[in-house]
């Protein structure tokens, strides 16, 4: 079955948590594999890690890519102090691997950027500091892999957050986990998402169906029929 709403993704995450399935290592591995398939070892990768679990996914990817011979830098504008538990463990693993983090972007553009600043839960406009960082990343014009959704783009509407609208990360690729919100398939979202890919993180169709239940399946089917 297809997962096409943010609430459905959250339902899958809750069931995985109850079953003791750690999804962040799977998401980070999927991101690392995605980068490794498109960039030679030894290249410079910049992972942008935000204050939530999206940042944790980026940290897992950073740790794995460093182990594969990539030159990886991590930027954490909000620092690690308020990371949720799973993301904190990803941060600790990154530090144990010899990694460090900066609050500021480097002077020179990397070969590729991993956008793990904000995920599908972001519902507020970006403030000036976050917007300035994203503007600088966009100005580099290097390949960008957005995890779940380009930061600054609403996963619920497919539109930039804010009034007037902000300027999200302009991704080359967007790698969604578990499901792709239907709004991200809308024509207006394509300019920000780039090419869209999906990783189910090894979860089976039966698991997904159990997580969202019959009502969720019916809603997903209706969304497919009425979507853009």
Swiss-Prot record:
Protein name: NAD(P)H-hydrate epimerase
Superkingdom, natural source: Bacteria
Keyword NADP: yes
Similarity section: Belongs to the NnrE/AIBP family.
MF annotations from Gene Ontology: metal ion binding; NAD(P)HX epimerase activity; nucleotide binding
Binding annotation for (6S)-NADPHX: 53-57, 119-125, 148
Organism from which the protein derives: Bordetella pertussis (strain Tohama I / ATCC BAA-589 / NCTC 13251)
UniProt EC number: 5.1.99.6
Primary gene name: nnrE
